[in-house]
Amino acid sequence: MTNSNLRTENHFDYVKITLASPERVMEWGQRTLPNGQVVGEVTKPETINYRTLKPEMDGLFCEKIFGPSKDWECHCGKYKRVRHRGIVCERCGVEVTESRVRRHRMGFIKLAAPVSHVWYLKGIPSYVAILLDMPLRDVEQIVYFNCYVVLDPGDHKELKYKQLLTEDEWLEIEDEIYAEESEIENEPVVGIGAEALKQLLEDLNLEEVAEQLREEINGSKGQKRAKLIKRLRVIDNFVATSARPEWMVLDVIPVIPPDLRPMVQLDGGRFATSDLNDLYRRVINRNNRLARLQEILAPEIIVRNEKRMLQEAVDALIDNGRRGRTVVGANNRPLKSLSDIIEGKQGRFRQNLLGKRVDYSGRSVIVVGPKLKMHQCGLPKEMAIELFQPFVIHRLIRQNIVNNIKAAKKLIQRADDEVMQVLQEVIDGHPIMLNRAPTLHRLGIQAFEPKLVDGRAIQLHPLVCPAFNADFDGDQMAVHVPLAIEAQTEARMLMLASNNILSPATGEPIVTPSQDMVLGSYYLTALQPGAEQPEFGDRSRTYSSLEDVIHAFEDTRIGLHDWVWVRFNGEVEDNDELDEPIKSETLSDGTRIEQWTYRRDRFDEDGALISRYILTTTGRVVMNHTIIGAVAAA
């Protein structure tokens, strides 16, 4: 017994997007029912019956082609329920199956005349024009029935292959050919529209043309050589993918599944429908009209006009507005074509496939966290409890604080102190990843150790801002939690912010202080013009250590830019321009004092340094003390 819902695994090496042949397009939409009937071609422009509200047969929502609109129920209602699975109703021809097949079953429209694919004709570059080695304007003249093109010059001496002729020119040549005194036996052949374009593309022998181009490239240079290389590259790609150039001219158009272009009933009884249905309807109407005109052998000028209108309808379906007038619906709003659905920021790829929401992630506004270490970020408690919930629940149960998941969730909702303590244990050593869109290089996403903070904003260390190109004027960042041990290890080893000091693009440091930090450092170390320098020994301005200066500043006994004498026995880089001290004095105990502009040294009898006082400002002491502390802690 087999289960039709079982998923089968298909292993493949790669996914390739290439041109589809007309046969392949028909394969997508064509199915043979168990009774031998072949279905798949959409021939009617109708969507649903306005009285029964059921899809019309052979229309754009046909249940025979695309599958039933209700689970396990045929169109006429003869078969209902799952027990009739797989049966094809002999009355309506609908297969009894799930309605979700309407999300992937396709149909097709067989065109009464070939039409050019607007992407390859009007794209940049125009592949049709490159392959035919003709100007795009000339190709457009042929496709849109403005000019004839010579497909075979025959015995006519003035005509050349691929030469363009206007209506009047061709009429003159026709008169010449069919004149009694004409000596032309092998008549020239001309064509117009996408049929002529298809003929030109079919006549191309890609391997021969490629060989000929290679020979020409060897003997040419400059712009001509670049043009030849461009054409050769396109031809080589066609050969490599086994695609034929004439496939750029469509004989069959695929109809996408109906559930991807739905029609829904609104409260007032009116219907809202996808724009694609209107565009498909235009194509089917014009195609059917053209087929009827061809059947009744209508005048060539009428048939040609209908072919041009069919070409424009297919252009609008594939890429509305790419050429000619944009097709508009109600309120003069341009209809969304297949290209509009796929491309752009709101398109299928960027919005729905690449822009999917993922579990264990969140986003919030960023604010500066100056007290954080570089590898840390502030994570709001409210966010952390949600992101790390499975880990918290697991630990609560393991520590016998609760017995089951339901009780754990209730406890978490109350945000008890116990829960916060467990959360702190969970996040300790568990890195999280921060991402700021747009992620233009690999440093746009980095790992940090989370620190629980109050409020609802993520705190970010100011030094990592250049890597993210972030500022604090309302920027938002996304948080992701790596779950597996391997992911956590990778995040810690490779992605931790403190391990990404250099830019991968230039090799230069990307962690550089800027803006507030530079301004703060400047303000801290700036000298106040005209500030009075104290004499050494002034009790209010002489201190025995850096800590004493900081304590005095905190007690507001001295200002940030006041000059102070402070004892400092470390190395000092002195830019004193004097060759000799301002004052040198030997004391009664044999020690010697040297007074310089910004320092005062005391040496013993052997010349060894006993003590050193330096003249500096409070701000510079604070800066120095902070740096020494940071280096010592590292």
Swiss-Prot record:
Subunit and partners: In cyanobacteria the RNAP catalytic core is composed of 2 alpha, 1 beta, 1 beta', 1 gamma and 1 omega subunit. When a sigma factor is associated with the core the holoenzyme is formed, which can initiate transcription.
Keywords, in A-Z order: DNA-directed RNA polymerase, Magnesium, Metal-binding, Nucleotidyltransferase, Transcription, Transferase, Zinc
Highest taxon of source: Bacteria
A single cellular component GO annotation: DNA-directed RNA polymerase complex
Function: DNA-dependent RNA polymerase catalyzes the transcription of DNA into RNA using the four ribonucleoside triphosphates as substrates.
Name of this protein: DNA-directed RNA polymerase subunit gamma
PANTHER family (UniProt xref): DNA-DIRECTED RNA POLYMERASE, DNA-DIRECTED RNA POLYMERASE SUBUNIT BETA
Binding site for Mg(2+): D471, D473, D475
Cofactor annotation remark: Binds 1 Mg(2+) ion per subunit. Binds 1 Zn(2+) ion per subunit.
Any one GO BP annotation for this protein: DNA-templated transcription
Names of required cofactors: Mg(2+); Zn(2+)
UniProt similarity note: Belongs to the RNA polymerase beta' chain family. RpoC1 subfamily.
Underlying gene: rpoC1
The EC number(s) this enzyme carries: 2.7.7.6
GO function terms (MF aspect): DNA binding; DNA-directed RNA polymerase activity; magnesium ion binding; zinc ion binding
InterPro entries (alphabetical): DNA-dir_RpoC1_gamma, DNA-dir_RpoC_beta_prime, RNA_pol_asu, RNA_pol_N, RNA_pol_Rpb1_1, RNA_pol_Rpb1_3, RNA_pol_Rpb1_3_sf, RNA_pol_Rpb1_clamp_domain
Binding site for Zn(2+): C74, C76, C89, C92
Catalytic activity: RNA(n) + a ribonucleoside 5'-triphosphate = RNA(n+1) + diphosphate
